[in-house]
Amino acid sequence: MKVSVIICAHNPHAGRLARTLAGLRAQSLPAADWECLLVDNASTPPLAPPPPGLPNLRIIGEPRPGLTHARRRGLRETAADLIVLADDDNVLAPDYLEQALHLAALHPRAGTFGGRSTPEFESPPAAWTREFFGLLALRDLGPGPLVAAAEQPPRAYPMCAPIGAGMVLRRAAAQAWLDAPDRGLPDRRGAELTSGGDNDIVLTAFAAGWDTAYFPELGLIHLIPAGRLEPAYLARLNRGIQKSWVQALTRHGVCPWPALPVWSVAPRQFKAWFTHRAWSGAAARIRWQGVCGRLEGLAR
C-alpha cells in the first residue's frame, strides 16, 4: 500500500460526498496501491455504506466530535507511508495520488505539501466575495513550486504551507503530530468554524525537521455551496479562523503579535468597529469580525 486517503465527514451532503468518491474512483494510480478511509465523525444518522466501485474504501466511526479527533483516528487506522487528507467536498484531480507519490520521491524532505484548490460554486459568487475566497480553502500560488525549508526554527508561518484540503503528509511527519502533546487548539467541530488543526500539523512537522511545500501539479476542485457565500457565514468563518490561527501561532512560538489582557479585548473590538467602518457593508463587517477573532486569539 503506497497511499492512504483519509476523508473526515460529519453529516456530509450526500451529493457532494458522492462527487468526492467519484473523484477517487477516477484515480490513475492502480487501486492496489492505495486505500481510502472514510471517518464518520459522529454523523446523525451514521453514514450509510457507499455504492459499489471502491473496493479499497473502509468506513470507521469516531464518536468524539471534532476534525482533530477524526484525523487522529484515521491516521492510526491507515498503513501507507504517504497520506492524503481530503474533505467530503473535495474532488481530487484524476492524477492526484500519482502526482503525490511522484512529488514525494522528488522532494524527500517535504513532510507536508499541497497544491491548487479551485472552486466550483453552486451559485455564481458576488464580486465582493472574492476578497474572502481564501477563507473557503481556495488557493492558487502560481505555476511554480514553493518550498519552505525547515533548516532553522521558523519565525513565521510558512506561506507555502498546505491547506487541509488535499494536504499530503509523510507518515513520519504525521507521527510527529500524533506523538506531540495535545495543544488544545480549536478545530472544526460540528457547526464551529475554527480551523487551527491544519496549522498545528504543519508547524509540528516543520519543528520536527520536515520541509513544507506547494506544488502546482496537485489540483482539486472544492465544491462550494451557496450558503458559504452568505455574509453571515463568512463573518462567522473569518472570526473563527482568525482566532484559531493566532492561537496556533502562539502555541508554536511564532506569533508576531503580543498577547493582550483579556479586559482590553472588548474595548479594542469596539474601536475596530469604527476603524473598519463595520456598518458600511457586508465586506466591512466580515473584515471587522476577523479583527475581533484575532483579538480574542491574543487574549491571555
Task: Outline where the language-model segments fall.
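Conserved donor NDP-sugar-binding/catalytic core segment of glycosyltransferases
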Residues: 95-129
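Acidic donor-binding loop at a coil-to-helix junction in glycosyltransferase catalytic cores
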Residues: 164, 184-201
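Non-catalytic, C-terminal membrane-associated alpha-helical segments of glycosyltransferases
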Residues: 236-243, 253-300
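Short, flexible, basic/aromatic active-site loop/helix in glycosyltransferases
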Residues: 133-159
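Short, acidic, metal-binding catalytic loop of nucleotide-sugar glycosyltransferases
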Residues: 22-33
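Glycine-rich, basic loop-to-helix element that forms the pyrophosphate-binding segment
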Residues: 62-78
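Short aromatic/hydrophobic "clamp" motif used to bind/position activated sugar donors
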Residues: 83
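A conserved acidic beta->alpha catalytic loop
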Residues: 23, 40-48, 90
